[in-house]
Amino acid sequence: MEQFRNIGIIGRLGSVQVLDTVRRLKRFLLDRHLHVILEETIAEVLPGHGLQTSSRKMLGEVCDMVIVVGGDGSLLGAARALARHNVPVLGINRGSLGFLTDIRPDELEVKCAEVLDGHYLVENRFLLQAEVRRHGEAIGQGDALNDVVLHPGKSTRMIEFEIYIDGQFVCSQKADGLIVATPTGSTAYALSAGGPIMHPKLDAIVIVPMYPHTLSGRPIVVDGNSELKIVVSKDMTIYPQVSCDGQNHFTCAPGDTITVSKKPQKLRLIHPLDHNYYEVCRTKLGWGSRLGGGGD
């Protein structure tokens, strides 16, 4: 297994709990004589830290591994910056759900020690890349680990659009919006809209209409290498928005085309050896526990 010597730390701002956990993590790593590099925004709220700092954009170039302290939203933001560097990412959960940041604060030292000793699992999670084109010219681009969402923004009106997959016309729809999600994002917004849960190892993309104006509008699961095109109706009078992971946004105009496809670079997500995806789903989604006479 890969050995890690240069460890980057990213933390969610505005949380006392996150800062406390970052301080614990910093002490733990320094006690193991590792080189610790702080992402510059978290470094600003840790005066006197005496450590090397780096921008988020460059952190992946100078680290063997990056540890994200926060919730899934924090890791989503980090993933978009780090995927292109192929640097492994480990998450310590200081949020509400923790599908991606799966180490609890109370087990920080034990689980991080296991990972640093070479006992860990690696998952390669693919991202989506989205581009909005107007009259043949790109006017907006973004990446997403969870989902790319077409929505009406501040308007309460429905959006009318056409869907194409690999150049083939699929259908036109009138709906509150459309969610294009990865397997990672299948337990996020797409799940709330009635989409299926997809195991992270699946090479697939799910297309989920948001409250479609027809009972036949259902989620579609397509090959992960598919190229999706969404064409906003020229007859629209509103300017819908495209959001990547709910964090990056750009505005569309009637007639614009949104292209969504798999990004070449993947996120290398690290888990402790005892990580169990189905246990995570059972815990986070409130699934039923084992029956008294259940199987082994």
From Swiss-Prot:
GO terms for molecular function: ATP binding; metal ion binding; NAD binding; NAD+ kinase activity. NAD(+) binds at residues 72-73, 146-147, 157, 174, 176, 187-192, 247. It is an enzyme of class 2 (transferase). SUPFAM superfamilies: NAD kinase/diacylglycerol kinase-like. The active site is at 72 (proton acceptor). The keyword Cytoplasm applies. One of its GO terms (cellular component) is cytoplasm. Its EC number is 2.7.1.23. It catalyses: NAD(+) + ATP = ADP + NADP(+) + H(+). One of its GO terms (biological process) is NADP biosynthetic process. InterPro entries: ATP-NAD_kinase_N, ATP-NAD_kinase_PpnK-typ_C, NAD/diacylglycerol_kinase_sf, NADK. Its main location: cytoplasm. It is found in: Cytoplasm. Keywords: ATP-binding, Cytoplasm, Kinase, NAD, NADP, Nucleotide-binding, Transferase. The keyword Transmembrane does not apply. Its cofactor is a divalent metal cation. Involved in the regulation of the intracellular balance of NAD and NADP, and is a key enzyme in the biosynthesis of NADP. Catalyzes specifically the phosphorylation on 2'-hydroxyl of the adenosine moiety of NAD to yield NADP. Belongs to the NAD kinase family. This is NAD kinase. It comes from Pseudomonas syringae pv. tomato (strain ATCC BAA-871 / DC3000).
